[in-house]
From Swiss-Prot:
<dbReference type="GO" id="GO:0003735">
    <property type="term" value="F:structural constituent of ribosome"/>
</dbReference>
<dbReference type="InterPro" id="IPR018257">
    <property type="entry name" value="Ribosomal_bL19_CS"/>
</dbReference>
<dbReference type="Pfam" id="PF01245">
    <property type="entry name" value="Ribosomal_L19"/>
</dbReference>
<dbReference type="GO" id="GO:0006412">
    <property type="term" value="P:translation"/>
</dbReference>
<dbReference type="InterPro" id="IPR038657">
    <property type="entry name" value="Ribosomal_bL19_sf"/>
</dbReference>
<comment type="function">
    <text>This protein is located at the 30S-50S ribosomal subunit interface and may play a role in the structure and function of the aminoacyl-tRNA binding site.</text>
</comment>
<keyword id="KW-0687">Ribonucleoprotein</keyword>
<keyword id="KW-0689">Ribosomal protein</keyword>
<comment type="similarity">
    <text>Belongs to the bacterial ribosomal protein bL19 family.</text>
</comment>
<dbReference type="GO" id="GO:0022625">
    <property type="term" value="C:cytosolic large ribosomal subunit"/>
</dbReference>
<dbReference type="InterPro" id="IPR008991">
    <property type="entry name" value="Translation_prot_SH3-like_sf"/>
</dbReference>
<protein>
    <recommendedName>
        <fullName>Large ribosomal subunit protein bL19</fullName>
    </recommendedName>
</protein>
<dbReference type="InterPro" id="IPR001857">
    <property type="entry name" value="Ribosomal_bL19"/>
</dbReference>
Amino acid sequence: MSDLIMKIEAQQKAENPPVFRVGDTVKVHFKIVEGKTERIQVYEGLVICFKNSGIGRTFTVRKNSYGVGVERVFPLHSPRIAKVEVVRPGKVRRAKLYYIRDKVGKAAKIKTLITKKNS
């Protein structure tokens, strides 16, 4: 039974899933179908968590829209995700950033991860 499930999941998985981490500010390019037309909507925000594993893995992106916090959950292996761009890598020490929901203003900011370039 598990071999059958693994075969089906292998077919459904994305070829190259995007590489990003919790704390990163990302732009998610998401395909939206309205009638016969298809367009791409960009959703930019902070990745606050990853959930589950395998084909059902999801990530939650939070942004402030007109002073109101908005969160959206995206399936990682969805064919509707065109691409995920990392705008700014973040430096965090937690796997789930749910505490950001209660923070306001400057307290809700995440430090930027600085990486060394190999010369």
